[in-house]
Amino acid sequence: MDMEIDDPMHGSDEDQLSPTLDEDMNSDDGKNNTKARSNDEDTDEELEDFNFKPGSSGIADHKSSKPLKLTNTNINQLDQWIEHLSKCEPLSEDDVARLCKMAVDVLQFEENVKPINVPVTICGDVHGQFHDLLELFKIGGPCPDTNYLFMGDYVDRGYYSVETVSYLVAMKVRYPHRITILRGNHESRQITQVYGFYDECLRKYGSANVWKMFTDLFDYFPVTALVDNKIFCLHGGLSPMIETIDQVRDLNRIQEVPHEGPMCDLLWSDPDDRGGWGISPRGAGFTFGQDISEQFNHTNDLSLIARAHQLVMEGYSWSHQQNVVTIFSAPNYCYRCGNQAAIMEVDENHNRQFLQYDPSVRPGEPTVTRKTPDYFL
């Protein structure tokens, strides 16, 4: 075993902008084949500056005045891309450019707080573990039959970040009212330069062009979702600058993830056993106690905060007397942590069931020339 678990109460899935693992948690198996109806609609080290500015890829230059309307040609193209990607084969650079431009014309019209109908299946971090993502869809049911909400962190650490994010974006464009993809702290130019996605793009495409396309696209991902006005979903956690959900609606999200402030906090913060607000060991965001989550839920008439962002050994973990749940959907994280993964199904009556799963069978590991920083110090 080549890692130590350092301060599990402040563990993360991995990253810090000082890294740790979360505690082992209680589990609860559940099965629910509910189908969907349509919605109405890291470390303390200094990071390199590649001088890539938001928008440098040009994918947003053509932005439309109204959402993308799929034509038969679009649908056929997307179906071909999805079939190609399902074999874990990356798209060509030209096809990535086409896909990202289509995705901008979908995502730019989504709100900071994306409204979601039940039933829905809520998913946590995936982190480039593409074969486990396919297993997730087997466990939860195929899209568009099942309505999915992903809470961020599609890239970095796993070997197949390109295929993973391409697949999810293609599914989003193909089924825009069946799948929601939120932004995680790894959907960031700065973080992906260090933790794998940038290097993977260089290795697979020979340049940073695809990385630039996707990181420009990440700026358009919604930062939160609200399931039937009762379950507030986001990647990280709460912010001392946000008391109401309406304040989230007022944020300008079309930017690189800031180093501080409310948008940063929503993607970086973690629940904690200690009350009140605390300094996060990650170096970004805050820790927040049960008193904070209870007050936020009361103020906004919520039943639950659902979030991802932290490795939990059984795939999900309740916090703050079930005011908060953490969901982690990358089994055997980093191909060595030995954790289960989970997704949470919410039915029409707001009943919640957790589906847990183990790693899928995957081919041999690809050749990787650069070792990314180890989170498990």
Swiss-Prot record:
Enumerate composition-biased segments (Basic and acidic residues): 28-40
Which UniProt keywords are listed?
Answer: Hydrolase, Manganese, Metal-binding, Methylation, Phosphoprotein, Protein phosphatase
Leucine methyl ester PTM positions read: 377
Subunit structure and binding partners: Inactivated in a complex with phosphatase methylesterase PPE1 (PP2Ai). Interacts with phosphatase 2A activator RRD2, which can reactivate PP2Ai by dissociating the catalytic subunit from the complex. Interacts with TAP42.
Query: What GO annotations for molecular function exist for this entry?
Result: metal ion binding; protein serine/threonine phosphatase activity
Q: Which residues bind Mn(2+) 2?
A: 153, 185, 235, 309
Native species of this protein? Saccharomyces cerevisiae (strain ATCC 204508 / S288c)
Q: Which residues bind Mn(2+) 1?
A: 125, 127, 153
What does UniProt list as catalytic? 186
Function field: Exact function not known, phosphatase 2A performs an essential cellular function.
Name this protein carries in UniProt:
Serine/threonine-protein phosphatase PP2A-2 catalytic subunit
Q: How is it modified after translation?
A: Reversibly methyl esterified on Leu-377 by leucine carboxyl methyltransferase 1 (PPM1) and protein phosphatase methylesterase 1 (PPE1). Carboxyl methylation influences the affinity of the catalytic subunit for the different regulatory subunits, thereby modulating the PP2A holoenzyme's substrate specificity, enzyme activity and cellular localization.
Region annotation Disordered: residue ranges?
Answer: 1-66
Give the Phosphoserine positions (modified residues). Answer: 38
Give the required cofactors.
Mn(2+)
Q: Name one GO biological process term.
A: TOR signaling
Q: Does Hydrolase show up as a keyword for this record?
A: yes
Q: Which family does it belong to?
A: Belongs to the PPP phosphatase family. PP-2A subfamily.
The answer to whether keyword Manganese applies is yes
Which leading EC class covers this enzyme? hydrolase
User: Among the entry's GO cellular component annotations, what is one?
Assistant: protein phosphatase type 2A complex
Question: Can you quote the record's cofactor note?
Answer: Binds 2 manganese ions per subunit.
List of residues that carry Phosphothreonine: 43
Q: What else is known?
A: Present with 4110 molecules/cell in log phase SD medium.
Here the disulfide bonds are none
Tree of life domain: Eukaryota
